[in-house]
Every structure is written in C-alpha cells, then in structure tokens.
C-alpha cells in the first residue's frame, strides 16, 4: 500500500516522465488517476466556496444600510437580497444577520471541501476503480459516463427545486413588481402551463420579444424552475438507467478531453445567457439591488425631466423637440405613446416605477398629469443618476464626460464578466474539441517535445 512515507508518492502521476504532461498542464497529468483528479476537483470546489464565504463577509463588513447596494460595489449581497433574505418593502435592508450567516456557512463548508481535496490529492488512493468501483470510471466506458451525466442532471434539478421551495414555502423571494415599489412575498400561483413556459423559448431574441430574457413576473420564473427541475431529474434518471444508443456512440467522441470540451461549450452558453439576463432583466435581477438597466436609466431620465418641466408649466403632450418629434412624448412604430427624445429607442422598457402610468395605448397623458407618485419621482431620479455605464477597469461614467462620477454598476460588472468568461470558455471549447477530435482520428501532432525550449533550460530545483 502506498503511504506518505514510502517514497512512491513523491513523483508518480505528477511529473513529465510518468504522465507525458509537464506540471503546467494541470489536470492533464491526472487523466488516468481518478483518485487524484477527485482531489483536484474537490480542492477547486473548496477554493470557490472559500471565495464566496470570504467575499460575502467582506461585503457585510463594508455594507452601509443607508446607501443602495448598487452604490457600494456589491456583487454577492444583491443575490442574497433577491432571494428575500434581510430585506423589506422597497428593497430596504432591515437585517444583515442572514448575510453574515451565509458567509460563515460558506467558510465552514470550504474548510470541509479543502480537507477533502487535500486528502484525496495527497493521501487517498491514486485510482478509485479497485477500492471504490462505484466512484471509479474509465473515460471510454460509455455506460458509466452517461450514468455520471445522469447524477449531475439530478443534482442540477434538485438545485432548481431549492429555489422553488424558497420562493413558495420558506419565506418567499423579493418581487420588484409588488405594489408600492417592491416587497418580499411567497410565490404561490406558479405558472405551469407548458405553452407559456416553452413559449418563451420560441420567442424572437430581438426587440420587444427578448426570448427567455423577457420574463417579467416571478410566477413564470418559479414555474419555469419547476419545469426545468423536473426535466433535469427525469433526464438524469433516464441517463442512469439507459445505455447510449448506437447513433450517439457513433456521433460523439468518448474521451476525457471530449467531455471537457462539451462542458466548456455548455458553460459558455450559460455565460452568454447570464450576460443578457443581468443586463436587460429587472425582474430576476431587481434594480433596487443591482441598479437600473441601461434602458431603465435612460427612460428614467426622460421621466424625471418630464416631471420637472410639467411642474414649470410645459404642456408635455404637445411640446415639440428640436427634430419636430414630440419633446417629451411621441408614438412608437406600433402606435403606443412613448417617451420622446433619445430614449425613444428604449421604448420597450418595462419597469415597476413606470407601468402604473401606462394605459391601453402606452403612456396615459391624464395619468402623467395627475397620478405621478412621489416614490416614482424619487426612484427615477435615483436611477437616472446611476446608469450602468463603466468599464472593466472600474472607471465609471460616460467616456466623454469630464465630470463623471466614478460609479460602476454591479450590472456592468456581472454582464461584462459573464460575457468575457463565456467567450473564453467558448475558445476553450474549440481548443479541446479540436484536440479531442484529432486524437480520436489518430492524427494529433502536438508540440515537438524533442526541441521544446524548456528542455534546454536549467531545472528549477
């Protein structure tokens, strides 16, 4: 038996001679060492969860309840607030203790994962096939691979149902559309109609359609999670019980690198969808926590100046702008009354502070004259001055504006980071898919190891 002290552990499976991969090729050294690969993955999970817990506590320590979350550069607390923890009417934070608990739970979990990762990387068996056949595998074993796929799908389905249970039974989640400016509520009347749920998938991705990103009520979102959770769990059971069909055995490449490329492609798609969701959707990502969307900030500016000039005596229904179109109000291509000026391009925006002022034909002139509430004015003025502008290097504001306030919206951060991550994951997919296909066809070249520069360098040790 191999132990820490009998010397064999030192290098096998870790150096270029025994694996064909140098240290910097990462987990490629562990392709055939299922026990060590398990250690690498568990340790990686520990690092992820440690970051989540530490960053969570960092945000709690720096949090100022009097300022909106999006003014404080927070990226984790908005997610917890969206799940209904610690917030009350209007998205006001009334209790930060749940956030503290979340951070501590993640830190404790990361310690457990870290221990498990180090154990399996250093002490545990190099391969699992002999001692723990249930957890062992061979990459070419198609039946085992689809069983593992099935287990993963079931875990994803359980994750979807956790959100359903939180929203429906355990305290509810934050609904930005609740009357009077948002509140936490239980989602009980779920949308389970397949025509509505799958109708989102059939929508055009453009304009007022917006594909699944256009979802704007929580009943649809939570009902969608019921459908997704059910499909994932049933699909998982199916993949555990069945073997791949002949067409799948022929069509797919069955190697570790191929599975890596499939996973990277899936994560890339998730990243691009998340980018669009966080940028455009103010229901799943409430503006109270993440700041307004771009269209929302633009429409808020038009609304704010309509309110101001109407108080100063302007007739907002008939005033002409410099182009001859309406200065404050105009008509959309389909005839609705919309805000005039540059914000006309964002006429499809729907936001909780604006919808009460719409009638059957768009913005209702009589409501704009008589029904505007103070909370709508306050909120739009706040959103107008917090547009999601800014760049990845945290320089906020319009690029051409010399007096811009250095503010970067969490929406900018989350959307750009997920776009960039989605892009790099896609490049990784192409790279590994190409290598996997070449290996399967038997013509991979790789780098000529005989003339690699590193071979002529002095060893580091």
Curated annotation (Swiss-Prot):
Transmembrane segment boundaries = 57-81, 122-143, 166-188, 243-263, 279-300, 435-459
By which gene is this protein encoded? psbC
What family is reported? Belongs to the PsbB/PsbC family. PsbC subfamily.
Per UniProt, the keywords (alphabetical) are: Acetylation, Chlorophyll, Chloroplast, Chromophore, Manganese, Membrane, Metal-binding, Phosphoprotein, Photosynthesis, Photosystem II, Plastid, Thylakoid, Transmembrane, Transmembrane helix
Per the record, the GO terms for biological process are: photosynthetic electron transport in photosystem II
Matching entries from InterPro entries are given as:
PS_antenna-like, PS_II_antenna-like_sf, PSII_PsbC, PSII_PsbC_sf
Know the name of this protein?
Answer: Photosystem II CP43 reaction center protein
Its placement in the membrane is given as: Multi-pass membrane protein
Q: Is the keyword Transmembrane in the record?
A: yes
Instruction: Enumerate the GO terms in the molecular function aspect.
Output: chlorophyll binding; electron transporter, transferring electrons within the cyclic electron transport pathway of photosynthesis activity; metal ion binding
Q: Where in the cell is it found?
A: Plastid, Chloroplast thylakoid membrane
Cofactor binding notes:
Binds multiple chlorophylls and provides some of the ligands for the Ca-4Mn-5O cluster of the oxygen-evolving complex. It may also provide a ligand for a Cl- that is required for oxygen evolution. PSII binds additional chlorophylls, carotenoids and specific lipids.
* Subunit text: PSII is composed of 1 copy each of membrane proteins PsbA, PsbB, PsbC, PsbD, PsbE, PsbF, PsbH, PsbI, PsbJ, PsbK, PsbL, PsbM, PsbT, PsbX, PsbY, PsbZ, Psb30/Ycf12, at least 3 peripheral proteins of the oxygen-evolving complex and a large number of cofactors. It forms dimeric complexes.
Q: Name one Pfam family in it.
A: PSII
Q: Which residues carry this modification: Phosphothreonine?
A: 3
In which residues is [CaMn4O5] cluster bound? 355
Its biological purpose is as follows: One of the components of the core complex of photosystem II (PSII). It binds chlorophyll and helps catalyze the primary light-induced photochemical processes of PSII. PSII is a light-driven water:plastoquinone oxidoreductase, using light energy to abstract electrons from H(2)O, generating O(2) and a proton gradient subsequently used for ATP formation.
Q: Which residues carry this modification: N-acetylthreonine?
A: 3
Annotated Gene3D superfamilies: photosystem ii from thermosynechococcus elongatus
Q: Which residues form the propeptide?
A: 1-2
Report disulfide bridges, numbered on this chain. Answer: none
Q: Which organism is it from?
A: Lotus japonicus (Lotus corniculatus var. japonicus)
Query: What GO cellular component entries does it have?
Result: chloroplast thylakoid membrane; photosystem II
């Amino acid at each position: 038996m191999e132990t820490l002290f009998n010397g064999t552990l030192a290098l096998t499976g870790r150096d270029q001679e025994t694996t064909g991969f140098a240290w910097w090729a990462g987990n490629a050294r562990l392709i055939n060492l299922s026990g060590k690969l398990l250690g690498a993955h568990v340790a990686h999970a520990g690092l992820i969860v440690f970051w989540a817990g530490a960053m969570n506590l960092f945000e709690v320590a720096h949090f100022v309840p009097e300022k909106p979350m999006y003014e404080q550069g927070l990226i984790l607390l908005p997610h917890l607030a969206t799940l209904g923890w610690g917030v009350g009417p209007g998205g006001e934070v009334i209790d930060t203790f749940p956030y503290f608990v979340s951070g501590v739970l993640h830190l404790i979990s990361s310690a457990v994962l870290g221990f498990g990762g180090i154990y399996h990387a250093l002490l545990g068996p190099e391969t699992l096939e002999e001692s723990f056949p249930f957890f062992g595998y061979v990459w070419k074993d198609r039946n085992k691979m689809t069983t593992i796929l099935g287990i993963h799908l079931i875990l994803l389905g359980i994750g979807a149902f956790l959100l359903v249970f939180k929203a429906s039974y355990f305290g509810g989640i934050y609904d930005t559309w609740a009357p009077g400016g948002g509140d936490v509520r239980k989602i009980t009347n779920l949308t389970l109609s397949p025509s509505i749920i799958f109708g989102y998938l059939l929508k055009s991705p453009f304009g007022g359609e917006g594909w699944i990103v256009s979802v704007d009520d929580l009943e649809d979102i939570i009902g969608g999670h019921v459908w997704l959770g059910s499909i994932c769990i049933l699909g998982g059971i199916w993949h555990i019980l069945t073997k791949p069909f002949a067409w799948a055995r022929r069509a797919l490449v069955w190697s570790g690198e191929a599975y890596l490329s499939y996973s990277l492609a899936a994560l890339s798609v998730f990243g691009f969808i998340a980018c669009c969701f966080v940028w455009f959707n103010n229901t799943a990502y409430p503006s109270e926590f993440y700041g307004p969307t771009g269209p929302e900030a633009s429409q808020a500016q038009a609304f704010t100046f309509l309110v101001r000039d109407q108080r100063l005596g302007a007739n907002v229904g008939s005033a002409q702008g410099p182009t001859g179109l309406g200065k404050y109000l105009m008509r959309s291509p389909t005839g609705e009354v919309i805000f005039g000026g540059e914000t006309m391009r964002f006429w499809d925006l729907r936001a909780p502070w604006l919808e009460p002022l719409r009638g059957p034909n768009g913005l209702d002139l009589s409501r704009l004259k008589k029904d505007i509430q103070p909370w709508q004015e306050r909120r739009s003025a706040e959103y107008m001055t917090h547009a999601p502008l800014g760049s990845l290097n945290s320089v906020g504001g319009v690029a051409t504006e010399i007096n811009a306030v250095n503010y970067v919206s969490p929406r900018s951060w989350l959307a750009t980071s997920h776009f960039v991550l989605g892009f790099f994951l896609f490049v990784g997919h192409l790279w590994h898919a190409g290598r996997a296909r070449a290996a399967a066809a038997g013509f991979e070249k790789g780098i000529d190891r005989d003339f690699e520069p590193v071979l002529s360098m002095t060893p580091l040790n």
